[in-house]
Amino acid sequence: MLAFTEVAYRGLLIEQDKRSAHRYVDSYEELKGKTLLDIGAAEAIFTLDTIEYIDHAYLFECDESWIEALEATFAPYKEKITIVRKYVSDVNDEDNITLDTFFRDEGKSIDNLFLKMNIEGYERIALEGAVHSLEHGRQIGGSVCIYHLHDDKKVIESELKKFNLKTSIQPGYLYFEKEMRSAIIRFWS
């Protein structure tokens, strides 16, 4: 019988299989030279898979149970990783930060970014806090989960198109909340 960790790991691998509706990119080559924002990082397997391609990654993760594991996992790459212990949102306070504020306060460029966003139904709120970055960032792209809320696909696609971003829906469906739903919308400038 497989141990829980083996089953969980296999699930993560299946999630990013080339045929999966939940796959974030067609090829990791797309991230070459990019700054990755892993929003809702959890175990950060996507960042780990792309670490050799990206310039830097910001891991946005608030769940303290992940922090020690993230620090250990990325110890060999500590110059390429920053763990941010805040929720990405449309407000700024002790626990939350908007992407626009994050980049302004850090003095970092909003160009050449890839946003991976899987935050359990808070994706549209996080996008509301990234208006400046999405409007003015050059060579910006990403993948956003669109299955957590019933109308995410329609609402999030509409929001992204307001910024003249091109979009595509990852083929396939997930069974979620007793419905077959598209899982990922990709966007790029």
Regions found by a protein language model. Name each.
Residues M1-F60, D63-S109, K153-K154, S158, ...:
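S-adenosyl-L-methionine
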Residues D49-Y53, A69-T73, A126-S133, V155-E159:
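A short acidic, amphipathic alpha-helical/loop segment
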Residues F60-E68, E123, H148-D151:
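Canonical radical SAM enzyme core domain
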Residues A75-K80, G107-K108, L134-Q139, K162-K166:
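Short helix-capping segments at alpha-helix termini
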Residues L115, R138-Y147:
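Conserved beta-strand signature within the Rossmann-like core of class I S-adenosyl-L-methionine
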Residues D95-N96, F102, A126-E135:
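Intrinsically disordered, low-complexity segments enriched in Gly and acidic/Ser/Thr residues
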Residues G40, K116-E120:
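Conserved S-adenosyl-L-methionine
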